[in-house]
């Protein structure tokens, strides 16, 4: 099966919701219910559903109301939107290096990048693996810096049974088509424990409307407290989100079990690859499974591309991985206030990483066939 894969219950209910005519967030019950259930799952007081994960990031930043020309520290290895959201909200991205194994933002490099203008840190839980939130929170509290958690790839990930997205000041998720949770192709969520941030986000994504003064009467109501925009999610998307949320723990357990059998194989080739498997206290969401060629291998970059090419020929979905150095994108080169020095670890990961898709809709027998292909491709390329 391909992912996303939607249940028969969801597919049948799409027709029912369409037939009801209540398809807009402001008319139906599912958007509000999705927000409440998501808050319960994460362990936060408030959540706001939006049209996509990028919108969620931009609104989250806006809610912090940072001073003009503020700097926001972000890992250089991530999806483009993790950094473009900073530019689109009028602030300055400062890129930090990442750990060579976890691929998450390095606390030591955050410390080096902090200036008087640093007002926030975006922690990206890349590939579903939680960042070192304890260390980051201690530093942020000491320096009075806000934390935004980008959980776009980390649905259900946790540290000591505490869900990612419940550590920072405000957090965001994406429900794009390839994510662990998908709301029919697009969707996003913002979550926080802070009422003032919730109030801003709730109003901003609906044209700045004061939702407490939004009753339908025969009179016209002036209820726009400030300028916002329309980033609402639909009722059908919200119903899909509720369906996915019900099954998230089951999905996550299956993804974890699948990842274990792949790592069992990769561990046989430690002369060629580095990899990271988290400790018991850290639960990854396993959005992608990463391993990295060792740089002391002759022609390691050529071998990497050959492995990826061979795996793809055999219908095993494989990638080089996340954008290794976002600041190399042409869009950032045009900005006068961005003059980054290339970051050592990000550069290395850009040359060594291999990412495998984890498809939890497949049976274990199908994964065993894929494992055999992976074994054959590795041994062929290293002439074992």
What are these regions (language model features)?
Residues 149-184, 213-215, 220-225:
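Conserved active-site segment immediately N-terminal to the catalytic lysine
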Residues 33-36, 44-47, 108, 120-124, ...:
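PLP-dependent aminotransferase class I/II
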């Amino acid at each position: 099966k391909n992912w996303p894969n939607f249940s028969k219950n969801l597919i049948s209910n799409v027709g029912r919701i369409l037939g009801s005519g209540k398809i807009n967030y402001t008319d139906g019950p599912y958007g509000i219910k999705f927000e409440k259930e998501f808050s319960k799952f994460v362990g936060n007081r408030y959540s706001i559903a939006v049209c996509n994960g990028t919108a969620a990031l931009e609104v989250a930043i806006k809610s912090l109301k940072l001073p003009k020309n503020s700097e926001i520290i972000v890992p250089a290895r991530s999806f483009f939107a993790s950094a473009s959201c900073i530019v689109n909200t009028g602030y300055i991205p400062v890129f930090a290096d990442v750990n060579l194994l976890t691929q998450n933002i390095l606390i030591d490099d955050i410390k080096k990048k902090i200036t008087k203008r640093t007002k926030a840190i975006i922690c990206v839980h890349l590939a579903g693996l939680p960042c070192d939130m304890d260390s980051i929170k201690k530093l942020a509290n000491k320096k009075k810096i806000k934390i935004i958690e980008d959980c776009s790839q980390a649905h259900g990930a946790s540290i000591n049974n505490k869900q990612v997205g419940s550590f920072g000041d405000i957090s965001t998720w994406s429900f794009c088509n390839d994510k662990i949770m998908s709301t029919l192709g697009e969707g996003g969520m913002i979550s926080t424990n802070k009422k003032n941030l919730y109030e801003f986000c709730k109003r901003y994504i609906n044209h700045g409307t004061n939702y407490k003064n939004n009753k339908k009467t025969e009179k016209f109501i002036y209820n726009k407290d400030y300028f916002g925009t329309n980033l609402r999610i639909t009722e059908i998307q919200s119903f899909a989100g509720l369906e996915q949320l019900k099954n998230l723990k089951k999905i996550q357990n299956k993804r974890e079990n699948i990842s274990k059998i792949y790592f069992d194989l990769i561990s046989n080739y430690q002369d060629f690859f580095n990899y990271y498997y988290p400790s018991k206290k850290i639960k990854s969401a396993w959005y992608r499974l990463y391993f990295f060629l060792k740089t002391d291998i002759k022609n390691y970059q050529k071998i990497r591309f050959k492995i990826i090419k061979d795996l793809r020929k055999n219908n095993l979905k494989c990638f080089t991985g996340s954008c290794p150095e976002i600041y190399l994108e042409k869009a950032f080169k045009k900005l006068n206030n961005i003059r980054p020095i290339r970051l050592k670890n990000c550069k290395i990961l850009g040359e060594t990483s291999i990412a495998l898709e984890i498809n939890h809709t497949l049976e274990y027998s199908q994964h065993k066939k894929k494992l055999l292909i992976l074994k054959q491709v590795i041994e062929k390329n290293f002439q074992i």
